[in-house]
């Protein structure tokens, strides 16, 4: 609830500022603006308001001291007067007036001279000076950097300001400079970072997340070689952050070839592992061959975890790097995990299309079955990936793997029906369905039969009496008709099929009824000269071609 209150207050302030700005632009307010100076002290300001104002570094620059706002400064007179008007008139926050008198500032002020006066003014209430002399923590420019910060820093460093003062997140000004680095303003940021480095700012000081300025320089999109070399002179090249990433991890991830080369030449640990077990080499290999060559040519022997590194390449679909490392004999793609997962199975799992095609073209075995009963095909269905499914089916998987795939697919309540139909359509064209159904083979398909009636129903086309496995799986409209195709006598006694519930009980009852009809009709026909000569199997075969109604009718006639 507190979060929502805070957000509502933020938006209220924000909208109020815009409303005031519109009012100021539509009406003549020169008499109001003249009433306010750019320098003001406000007592006991709500911290939420201070936090909000501090998020607008491009509009306002705020100095704090305890519960008071010491100073509000902006390059734009109108913006400054708007916020002062807002604090005075809208929020009714009391002020004690300016603590530096008679500056008479205008929009064309000399910033350097102005800041110098702020720091050195002899007024007894000069709280900025008191704050610096007492070594108080402040976030006035440590947390929120504006265009004029370089001038602030130069003056304050010359007056003994502690250059590595921390904010509430443990960040120094050097941290913040790198956090907020903008390419569009790189010249200003580069100048400030050099000032801080040349004045001894600690490049190994960690914030609350374990980031040092040097780690941040490696992590962020800053490609200034001069700054990197200055930092490198005093930095711990193997320092780690909260996730145990080193500078070499980050420059490898960012594909900063020159920085990687410098760190390796300085002896950075190429086998350092982060908390996820990844080394800098793993981070670099996804970007291409140049970084791979750089690592392989280093004097230190690389620690290679084959399964880990191949899977890493698969996740990023880095085919070029995979091919190069295979050609150098660094990795082997023919691994199997304890779950019987292969590199091809991993490529399907991570939707790495290019890698999958590459591995299949190398005659990789994709007919693997994991310990949980999954296959590459069932995994493609689970990922709803039609393109990968088409690639796998184009490689002509066997009947065994297709049946196992469909069983695995239908074990899940939710699956892509269209992809399952692709499997059925492919399997229906195969010629391996010559065996008549019996109890044992029925057990093999029970999960499939039970869970995909809709898909089966679409494939039904014929009602041949002696059903094969193909006809049972793909041509039956309803499970109740199973009783017409149970060729094995013990099917009637198969109690394990009770998983089907009432349907199976009805099937068994129907089969018993049909068996009784056939038996009775056969006995009725036995007195005939020719019928009694037939073996019982032939009698049964002939009578089985009649449906239940026909059998009942013949019995009545006889």
Swiss-Prot record:
Coiled coil: none annotated. Disulfide bonds: none annotated. This is Ankyrin repeat protein OPG189. InterPro entries: Ankyrin_rpt (IPR002110), Ankyrin_rpt-contain_sf (IPR036770), PRANC_domain (IPR018272). Keywords: ANK repeat, Late protein, Repeat. Contributes to viral release without involving rearrangement of host actin. The lineage of its organism: Viruses, Varidnaviria, Bamfordvirae, Nucleocytoviricota, Pokkesviricetes. Belongs to the orthopoxvirus OPG189 protein family. ANK repeats lie at residues 65-95, 169-205, 209-239, 243-272, 276-304, 339-368, 372-401. Pfam families: Ank_2 (PF12796), PRANC (PF09372).
């Amino acid at each position: 609830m507190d979060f929502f209150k805070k957000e509502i207050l933020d938006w209220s302030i924000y909208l109020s500022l815009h409303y005031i700005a519109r009012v100021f632009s539509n009406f003549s307010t020169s008499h109001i603006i003249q009433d306010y100076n750019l320098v003001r002290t406000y007592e006991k300001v709500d911290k939420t308001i201070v936090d909000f104002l501090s998020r607008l570094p491009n509009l306002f620059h705020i100095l704090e001291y305890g519960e008071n706002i010491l100073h509000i400064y902006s390059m734009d007179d109108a913006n400054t007067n708007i916020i002062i008007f807002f604090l005075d008139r809208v929020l009714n926050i009391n002020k004690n007036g300016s603590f530096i008198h008679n500056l008479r500032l205008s929009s064309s002020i000399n910033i350097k001279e102005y800041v110098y006066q702020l720091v050195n003014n002899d007024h007894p209430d000069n709280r900025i000076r008191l704050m610096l002399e007492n070594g108080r923590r402040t976030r006035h420019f440590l947390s929120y950097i504006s265009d004029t910060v370089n001038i602030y820093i130069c003056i304050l460093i010359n007056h003994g300001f502690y250059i590595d003062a921390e904010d509430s997140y443990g960040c120094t000004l050097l941290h913040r400079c790198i956090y907020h680095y903008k390419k569009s303003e790189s010249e200003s940021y580069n100048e400030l970072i050099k000032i801080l480095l040349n004045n001894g700012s600690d490049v190994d000081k960690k914030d609350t997340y374990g980031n040092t300025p040097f780690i941040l320089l490696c992590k962020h999109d800053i490609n200034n070689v001069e700054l990197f070399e200055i930092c490198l002179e005093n930095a711990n090249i193997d320092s780690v952050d909260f996730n145990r990433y080193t500078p070499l991890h980050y420059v490898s991830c960012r594909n900063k070839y020159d920085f990687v080369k410098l760190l390796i030449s300085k002896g950075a640990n190429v086998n350092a592992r982060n908390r996820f077990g990844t080394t800098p080499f793993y981070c670099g290999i996804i970007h291409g061959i140049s970084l791979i060559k750089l690592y392989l040519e280093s004097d230190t022997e690389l620690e290679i975890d084959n399964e880990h590194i191949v899977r890493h390449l698969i996740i990023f679909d880095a085919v070029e790097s995979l091919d190069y490392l295979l050609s150098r004999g660094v990795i082997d793609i023919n691994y199997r995990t304890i779950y019987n997962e292969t590199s091809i199975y991993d490529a399907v799992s991570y939707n790495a299309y290019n890698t999958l095609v590459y591995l299949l073209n190398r005659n990789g075995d994709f007919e693997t079955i994991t310990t949980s009963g999954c296959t590459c095909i069932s995994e493609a269905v689970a990922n709803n990936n039609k393109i990968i499914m088409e690639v796998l089916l184009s490689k002509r998987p066997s009947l065994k793997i297709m049946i196992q795939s469909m069983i695995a697919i239908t074990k899940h309540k939710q699956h892509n029906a269209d992809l399952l139909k692709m499997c059925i359509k492919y399997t229906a064209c195969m010629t391996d369905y010559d065996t008549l159904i019996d109890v044992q083979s029925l057990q093999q398909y029970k999960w499939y039969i039970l869970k995909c009636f809709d898909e089966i129903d679409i494939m039904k086309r014929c009602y041949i009496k002696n059903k094969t496995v193909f006809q049972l799986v793909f041509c039956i409209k309803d499970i109740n008709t199973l009783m017409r195709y149970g060729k094995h006598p013990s099917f009637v006694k198969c109690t394990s099929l009770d998983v089907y519930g009432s349907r199976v009980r009805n099937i068994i009852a129907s089969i018993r009824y049909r068996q009784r009809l056939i038996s009775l009709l056969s006995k009725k026909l036995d007195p005939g000269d020719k019928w009694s000569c037939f073996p019982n199997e032939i009698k049964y075969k002939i009578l089985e071609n009649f449906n239940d109604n026909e059998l009942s009718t013949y019995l009545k006639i006889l």
